[in-house]
């Protein structure tokens, strides 16, 4: 179906081999679209979660409510800027090869496990920061997972087209939910008018665990796919060992360095330093044991991380804020949420939780 369009694409007669895409450009574009939709869903649901937390905490003081309203209004203004960012991320994920995407996934998995294990009492704050920082890594995880699962399929483009359509639908629904909650949650939750807002009011604390379970599933599949994709480029066990040994050492040193550098720095500063250090380390590694195509793709990863993190710095600051360190649903179970009611007929007292 796409053979006519593929005939106009550059071939190895005009471009060097390291500039040629690993797969069909149409397949790469569909994989990038799925990855960008996954990033959009993650950002929308994280904004909903942090909005619920801030809304619950701002109800305690009028000053907090006045200070929180402009921030929420600014977050809802996406429009053309949001669509431009979406298509930029789609293009970057389409260009980045499956090999470099696999390396990004493995590095993120190792860094996340190490960070959560050493987080201590700041576990929930660290978890929110990890979810915000994982945007481009989620796109790489979905892209390399689709590359691995559909490799060798006779109708690969059709499967990817269906996956892209479903991802687009989920991204649109998540965006609509975000705008609905930010605009009407306070009114609907107070008047018990909207089923969606009432569900979030009663079960909003389940949103973060649901996101965590989804991320665990996504990166578990992506980790298996990444190891398989990387091993496909080696003809013998000696070549594989020569690649995996410096890779493991480099990843371990990067994780240790970033854990030490996070102390005493602000949230935005930590994120920018982390991106520069880990992608810089990957570039040095690829210059040593990789290919020129890998170096080019890592440079594209710099742009991808920037296009994901810079527009969502407010989201990262909200995830790092001290106002959301303790879940507001836990606070509502204290003594202030208790009331005593007496039955007029039997005289029995009941203790109610609001």
Which residues make up each language-model segment?
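Loop-to-transmembrane alpha-helix initiation sites
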Residues: 155-157, 243, 290-302
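Hydrophobic alpha-helical membrane segments
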Residues: 245-259, 267-286
């Amino acid at each position: 179906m796409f053979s006519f369009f593929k005939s106009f694409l550059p071939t190895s007669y005009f471009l060097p081999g390291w500039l040629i895409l690993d797969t069909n450009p149409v397949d790469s574009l569909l994989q990038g679209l799925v990855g960008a939709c996954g990033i959009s869903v993650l950002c929308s649901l994280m904004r909903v979660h942090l909005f619920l937390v801030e809304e619950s905490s701002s109800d305690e003081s009028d000053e907090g409510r006045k200070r929180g309203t402009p921030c929420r209004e600014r977050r809802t203004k996406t429009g053309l800027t949001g669509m431009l960012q979406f298509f930029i991320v789609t293009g970057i994920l389409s260009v980045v090869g499956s090999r470099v995407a696999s390396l990004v996934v493995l590095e993120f998995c190792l860094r996340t496990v190490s960070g959560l294990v050493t987080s201590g009492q700041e576990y929930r704050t660290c978890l929110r920061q990890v979810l915000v920082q994982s945007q481009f890594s989620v796109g790489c995880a979905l892209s390399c997972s689709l590359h691995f699962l559909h490799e060798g399929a006779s109708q690969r483009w059709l499967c990817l087209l269906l996956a892209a359509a479903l991802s687009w639908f989920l991204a649109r629904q998540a965006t609509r939910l975000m705008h609905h909650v930010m605009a009407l949650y306070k009114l609907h939750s107070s008047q018990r008018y909207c089923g969606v807002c009432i569900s979030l009011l009663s079960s909003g604390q389940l949103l973060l665990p649901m996101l965590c379970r989804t991320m665990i599933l996504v990166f578990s599949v992506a980790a298996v796919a990444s190891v398989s994709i990387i091993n496909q480029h080696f003809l013998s066990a000696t070549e594989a060992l020569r690649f995996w040994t410096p890779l493991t050492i480099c990843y371990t040193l990067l994780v240790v360095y970033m854990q030490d550098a996070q102390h005493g720095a602000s949230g935005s500063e930590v994120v920018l330093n982390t991106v520069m250090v880990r992608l810089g380390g990957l570039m040095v590694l690829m210059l040593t044991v990789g290919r020129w195509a890998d170096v080019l793709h890592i440079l594209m990863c710099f742009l991808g991380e920037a296009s994901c993190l810079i527009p969502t710095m407010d989201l990262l600051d909200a995830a790092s804020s001290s106002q959301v360190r303790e879940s507001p649903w836990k606070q509502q179970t204290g003594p202030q949420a208790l009331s005593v009611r007496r039955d007029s007929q039997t005289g029995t007292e009941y203790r109610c939780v609001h």
